[in-house]
């Protein structure tokens, strides 16, 4: 199981290293799915959009960098990410955990090499 990011599928200004690393993570998961399938090993990716609550990444300079890149105040970060989603909802740690649980469960026993976006509908991250 890999936890990627919306940025694995959609670029963000000022985050090229992060976006590249997350895109590479998806491709690694695909390669491992191919290699592991004969052994019954499943490999999937959960791609969340910004998980603000409970994430330490937002306590450092990342918050300021993302606010500056999006031309908003740092206090408006969570609202900005919520409003840019089609469903107008925030993504929480438990949402990501539930997606991981699904892929780890027998309910997804016939799934490998897949990506599940947990982003409340971020259109730029739609797979094409």
Explain the meaning of each model-derived region:
Residues 37, 42, 111-113:
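Short, small/polar-rich loop/turn modules that mediate ligand/substrate recognition or access, typified
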Residues 21, 29:
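Active-site helix of classical SDR
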Residues 100-101, 112-128:
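Short C-terminal tail/terminal secondary-structure segment
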Residues 5:
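Residue(s) in the substrate-gating loop at a strand-loop-helix junction
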Residues 72-74, 85-96:
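A conserved structural motif in NAD(P)-dependent oxidoreductases
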Residues 51-84, 127-128:
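A glycine/serine/threonine-rich, flexible loop-to-helix segment
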Residues 10-16, 38, 88, 106:
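Active-site loop immediately N-terminal to the catalytic Tyr-X3-Lys motif
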Residues 36-38, 51, 104:
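A short hydrophobic alpha-helix cap/turn motif
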